[in-house]
Amino acid sequence: MLRLKTQDSRLKTQDSRLKTQDSRLKTQDSRLKTQDSRLKTQDSRLKTQDSRLKTQDSRLKTQDSRLKTQDSRLKTQDSRLKTQDSRLKTQDSFSVDDNGSGNVFVCGDLVNSKENKVQFNGNNNKLIIEDDVECRWLTVIFRGDNNYVRIHKNSKIKGDIVATKGSKVIIGRRTTIGAGFEVVTDKCNVTIGHDCMIARDVILRASDGHPIFDIHSKKRINWAKDIIISSYVWVGRNVSIMKGVSVGSGSVIGYGSIVTKDVPSMCAAAGNPAKIIKRNIIWARTDKAELISDDKRCSSYHAKLTQ
């Protein structure tokens, strides 16, 4: 009997413990449910925040797109204003007299330019002046059709250019030309290379200006011929270079010369008519240079011409 009571007491104790454990498990389960509910709430909040962030990101992208569009429009307006400003500067520095049709004048951003004139007396002529060119008291006259004149960037030029009957005149980069300069053409080409130094009152006459005939054949005998001045040539003051002449790179033409025959590269020529007085020379724009290496441009051309 005593044993049964003891077993019964033990069973009751175990049952009590099981109930306690069950109560604890229920409590834990309740806590887990609470945590799960909180996690779901947090997850919902995170999803809401993520949705808001996506909405904000979308709005920011839209704003960024609008800003880019506005920036593009502002750049376009700025470009137009610069173009208008360039045209106004060109109009301010050039007077244009167009007496034909199909004529074109393209002008870049000029430097310190004033009192220039362009006159078109014909059709389909073209004048192109590139950026950073300094034009002062320059007159360009087109006579007839299909003439072409181009002045490359970083050049400085004064004087008169007359292009006649399908002629072409090209002036290279960084070339400087003094006042009183004159180019006369007639169905021919005049080319001045890069880095040339042309003094005041220089005349390049590719045409005699008026025809001369043989009285027996009755045919013209003085047709115009091309003039070519290569890059890096120094032409002194009051020089006249006549039709058909070519002057080689690195050469110098002395004061007051009349050049009727070709001058090779790296030669000094002078006189009337000009003759070669010294070979194997090269000049420098820098007046203080004592060696070829003292002038970068001179050194560069010397290397090219002697390699």
From Swiss-Prot:
EC code: 2.3.1.136
UniProt-listed InterPro entries: Hexapep_transf_CS (IPR018357), Hexapeptide_acetyltransf (IPR051159), Trimer_LpxA-like_sf (IPR011004)
Catalyzed chemical reaction(s): [N-acetyl-alpha-D-neuraminosyl-(2->8)](n) + n acetyl-CoA = [N,O(9)-diacetyl-alpha-D-neuraminosyl-(2->8)](n) + n CoA; [N-acetyl-alpha-D-neuraminosyl-(2->8)](n) + n acetyl-CoA = [O(7),N-diacetyl-alpha-D-neuraminosyl-(2->8)](n) + n CoA
Molecular function (Gene Ontology), one example: polysialic-acid O-acetyltransferase activity
Keyword Transferase: yes
UniProt signal peptide: none
Keyword Repeat among UniProt keywords: yes
Binding site residues for acetyl-CoA: 208-210, 237, 243, 261, 278
Region of interest (Disordered), ranges: 1-95
Comp. bias regions, Basic and acidic residues: 1-90
Enzyme class per UniProt: transferase
General remark: Polymeric sialic acid-containing capsule provides a means for the bacteria to evade the immune response during infection by mimicking host sialic acid-containing cell surface structures. O-acetylation of the sialic acid residues of capsular polysaccharides alters their immunogenicity and susceptibility to glycosidases.
Name of the protein described by the UniProt record: Polysialic acid O-acetyltransferase
Species this protein is from: Escherichia coli O1:K1 / APEC
